[in-house]
Amino acid sequence: MGILNLWRQFGRRYFWSHLLLGVVAASIGAPTILAGVTDNISQANTSPSQSWQNQALSAFDNLFSLQNVQHQPANGVNYWQQHAVRNVIRQLSFAFSISQPMSDETAKQSIRLSSSNIQQLVLETLNTLLIREPKPPEPVLDIPFLNVASQSSYILTLWIAKAQGIRAGPTAYL
């Protein structure tokens, strides 16, 4: 297999998907949200309790259901934007499901409440990005035109502006 084919496969499998993931993550501020999660991952205990695992799994059922929701194909959202958002949802599902079990119950409760609010906010934002329907711009049809040109003097730019709604061009005649 040639080096060009290997490079093409690497780009298709890894580079472009991670580039899109980074663009979406940077645009919604995920690096600042996940900063505390990565600290918790590095300090995570290797033997968490079974109840903690059950709580973590039940907390992210909503996340997996958001990822698997079928959307209307005609909603006007860019395919690559949907792909990147789904990748972000998938990555966040793993990042949010790993956190450090704590010994103090009050600290554990406060961190769980604050992180669950942030996680829910991020997931709702991503879901909104995924299923939103952008409204197309409405053309302005009723533009008053001054009839300064007579029938004998035909001006192409005024006709194009009047017929096709172009607003650029000479403003003295419009």
Swiss-Prot record:
Coiled-coil features, chain-numbered ranges: none
Domain of life: Bacteria
UniProt KW Cytoplasm keyword: yes
Keywords linked to the UniProt accession: Cytoplasm, Periplasm, Signal
GO MF: translation regulator activity
Main function: Regulates secA expression by translational coupling of the secM secA operon. Translational pausing at a specific Pro residue 5 residues before the end of the protein may allow disruption of a mRNA repressor helix that normally suppresses secA translation initiation.
Protein name: Secretion monitor
Taxon lineage: Bacteria, Pseudomonadati, Pseudomonadota, Gammaproteobacteria, Enterobacterales
